[in-house]
Amino acid sequence: MLNRFSYSSNAWHNLRVDGPDADGIAVIVLARSQSRNALTLPMLTDMVQLLSAMDADDSVKCIVFTGEGPFFCSGVDLTEGFGEIGKTRDTHRDAGGKLALAIHNCRKPTIAAINGTAVGVGITMTLPMSIRIAAKTAKISFPFVRRGIVADAASSFYLPRLVGYGRALHLFTTGALYPAESGLLHGLFSETVNPASSTLPRALEVARDIAVNASQVGVYLTRDLVYRSPRSPEQAHLLESAALYTRYQSRDFEEGVKSFLEKRKPRFQDTMREQSSEGVLERGDCVVGLASKPKL
């Protein structure tokens, strides 16, 4: 069975995987500290594979990413690159974007424990994650224009939604390095912590709170609703009502109410695997929900 697979014993490329532990928390560590955790194509490919496996694994309830050593990730390893350029504009696919979409499409909550400087895809890969916690000493840069290219990893979608269009344009246009607590990054991080060594412990604390106290299916559907970006309150009302209809009939709803009234920790049982064929939400021509995932 998939949930018996040992992530930690598999030979990943410059990645260390811990867990999932008894609470369902898995940690993916970028383990290339001698190169400031710069990403290579094999690392990226392995992360996409890991996310796909953990998405389908009921024993995984939350995924935390962090970096080995003082850096989180210095971006793509420019000495190796991210593979060949597509033969045409229409066939080329950004490798960083494939990772971003794998994170976005993973139905488990993801947390970035940004323990140090994050540059380029090192920061854009975190934008689709549910939560970002950064060390106060971390430095952040979106340096694409300084390399003669443009934003990657679907960051032109995520960054403006996180920090606002004005700040996003400033960050993209300058490509400069900013401290994690810069006003330009306001909205990007849920928390900034000090010292840097406390970044992962704090992320694990948040992950444990989610894994122990929140319904997996409820967490996913709520995030799905947020990303639908309804154009009006009425549209949001219809989407929420459709999702609530399915959840009112779930074991998790019954347990959530019962545990609250009994003043105890909930024991949620619904899993993504069991719910994979329900909960479809429609919006115009777009059908979204547990069963819908765009191909990478």
Curated annotation (Swiss-Prot):
Pfam families: ECH_1 (PF00378). InterPro entries: ClpP/crotonase-like_dom_sf (IPR029045), ECH/Chromodomain_protein (IPR051053), Enoyl-CoA_hydra/iso (IPR001753). Keywords: Lyase, Peroxisome, Virulence. Its EC number is 4.2.1.17. Its main location: other. It comes from the Eukaryota. It is found in: Peroxisome. GO terms for molecular function: enoyl-CoA hydratase activity. Disruption phenotype: Abolishes the production of AF-toxins and their precuror 9,10-epoxy-8-hydroxy-9-methyl-decatrienoic acid; and impairs the pathogenicity. It catalyses: a (3S)-3-hydroxyacyl-CoA = a (2E)-enoyl-CoA + H2O; a 4-saturated-(3S)-3-hydroxyacyl-CoA = a (3E)-enoyl-CoA + H2O. Pathway: Mycotoxin biosynthesis. CDD domains: crotonase-like. GO terms for cellular component: peroxisome. A motif (Peroxisomal targeting signal type 1) lies at residues 294-296. Belongs to the enoyl-CoA hydratase/isomerase family. Gene clusters encoding host-selective toxins (HSTs) are localized on conditionally dispensable chromosomes (CDCs), also called supernumerary chromosomes, where they are present in multiple copies. The CDCs are not essential for saprophytic growth but controls host-selective pathogenicity. Enoyl-CoA hydratase; part of the gene clusters that mediate the biosynthesis of the host-selective toxins (HSTs) AK-toxins responsible for Japanese pear black spot disease by the Japanese pear pathotype. AK-toxins are esters of 9,10-epoxy 8-hydroxy 9-methyldecatrienoic acid (EDA). On cellular level, AK-toxins affect plasma membrane of susceptible cells and cause a sudden increase in loss of K(+) after a few minutes of toxin treatment. This is Enoyl-CoA hydratase AKT3-1. It comes from Alternaria alternata. The gene is AKT3-1.
